């Protein structure tokens, strides 16, 4: 109860502090309601279209709510990462993957850049929010609901992992890009000397590349108004297949993992990077298995192992040491799917298509 009161107080303070603050993105102005979250050099705000920008529906002004992500980019590398994130929000045309509504790159007076990305606001919250509510209420998720959520998230991942699954959307993607590439006039000038990745600028090549999210967690699974699970926060998403060819690349990737991956859901191959190592989209299958486990039991598998046996989290992950609670209410078939995902050897994990088939068999 005390924590709920504190959260309410903080929200009221946030709302009061931002009551007159607005952010302009292209031709629309958004009034900040409160801070939703922050991390590193990025902030996410709950915003509302200002009066002059309200959407008119049947003659009625609709006060639309959005999530607005602000990314501060002090370096060439950070602007490159930010631009990749912008492209990610337009790349995957699936109801199970988040899409942006608008975006803009702004030049600041000190020479740095700031990226603004307008995203849908998911009022139903995240999968982690749902798990937390059940823990507080002492209720449990049914197997049928588990499978429904798992199927949706896996379908979203299939869109990232499998270029063939995006072919049906190739035509619509061109139209979406034509509309949504509405950056400010100065954007081209800002990015003249930025070493952007080639796949960011070529829709043709992007359609043939497999991508990995690399930070699938319950907090990054959102629920749409009709209850569909939606993969969110594509800031960590990039080309799936990577070969570590030199020590500089190894060092940079290690730093990236530390900054972008959530440890309880991070696969062992990302914690033990080596020269000549090949990384693939199978990193997401491990994270997905851990996320499914958390949905079912309210705690991630390796954090549970740490609590029960005192093993370090990293050691438990590297050895794949975890267990299921005794007398589980879930079927052996569903537990078997989790076991297949949480395999230390990536080769032993199913592909996204194989995982989808396993879940569909449970759904029949």
From Swiss-Prot:
Q: Which residues form the Protein kinase domain?
A: 30-364
Q: Which SUPFAM superfamilies match?
A: Protein kinase-like (PK-like) (SSF56112)
Q: Which GO terms describe its biological process?
A: regulation of vacuole fusion, non-autophagic; vacuolar protein processing
Source organism per entry reads: Saccharomyces cerevisiae (strain ATCC 204508 / S288c)
At which residues does the record annotate a lipid attachment of kind S-palmitoyl cysteine? 13-15
Protein's UniProt name: Serine/threonine-protein kinase ENV7
A GO cellular component entry from the record: fungal-type vacuole membrane
Role description = Serine/threonine-protein kinase involved in vacuolar processing and morphology.
Q: How does it sit in the membrane?
A: Peripheral membrane protein
Q: Where in the cell is it found?
A: Vacuole membrane
| EC number(s) on file | 2.7.11.1
Extract the InterPro entries matched here. Answer: Kinase-like_dom_sf, Prot_kinase_dom, Protein_kinase_ATP_BS, Ser/Thr-specific_kinases
Task: Name the domain of life this protein comes from.
Answer: Eukaryota
KO phenotype (gene knockout): Leads to internal accumulation of precursor CPY.
Q: Which molecular function GO terms apply here?
A: ATP binding; protein serine kinase activity; protein serine/threonine kinase activity
């Amino acid at each position: 109860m005390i924590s709920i009161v504190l959260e309410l107080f903080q929200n009221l303070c946030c709302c009061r502090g931002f009551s007159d603050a607005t952010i302009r993105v292209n031709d629309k102005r958004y009034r900040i309601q409160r801070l939703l979250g922050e991390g590193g050099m990025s902030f996410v705000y709950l915003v509302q279209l200002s009066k002059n920008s309200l959407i008119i529906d049947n003659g009625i002004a609709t006060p639309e709510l959005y999530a607005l992500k602000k990314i501060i980019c002090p370096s060439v590398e950070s602007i490159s990462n930010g631009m990749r994130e912008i492209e990610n929000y337009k790349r995957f045309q699936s109801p199970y993957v988040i899409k942006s509504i608008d975006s803009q790159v702004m030049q600041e007076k000190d020479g740095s850049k700031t990226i603004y990305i307008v995203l849908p606001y998911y009022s139903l919250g995240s999968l982690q929010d749902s798990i937390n509510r059940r823990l507080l209420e002492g209720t449990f998720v049914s197997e049928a609901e588990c499978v429904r959520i798992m199927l949706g998230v896996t379908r979203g991942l299939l869109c990232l992992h499998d270029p063939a699954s995006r072919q049906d959307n190739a035509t619509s993607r061109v139209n979406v890009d034509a509309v949504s590439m509405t950056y400010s006039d100065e954007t081209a000038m800002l990015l003249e000397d930025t070493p952007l990745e080639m796949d960011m600028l070529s829709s043709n090549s992007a359609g043939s590349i497999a991508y990995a999210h690399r930070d699938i967690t319950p907090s990054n699974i959102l629920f749409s108004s009709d209850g569909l699970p939606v993969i969110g926060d594509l800031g960590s998403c990039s080309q799936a297949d990577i070969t570590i060819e030199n020590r500089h690349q190894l060092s940079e990737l290690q730093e990236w993992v530390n900054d972008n991956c959530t440890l309880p859901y991070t696969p062992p191959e990302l914690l033990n990077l080596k020269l000549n190592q090949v990384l693939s989209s199978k990193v997401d299958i491990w994270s997905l298995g851990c996320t499914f486990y958390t949905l079912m039991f309210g705690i991630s598998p390796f954090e549970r192992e740490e609590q029960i046996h005192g093993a370090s989290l990293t050691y438990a992950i590297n050895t794949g040491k975890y267990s299921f609670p005794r007398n589980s209410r879930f079927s052996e078939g569903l537990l078997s799917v989790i076991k297949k995902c949480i395999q230390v050897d990536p080769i032993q994990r199913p592909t996204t298509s194989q995982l989808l088939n396993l879940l569909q068999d449970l759904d029949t």
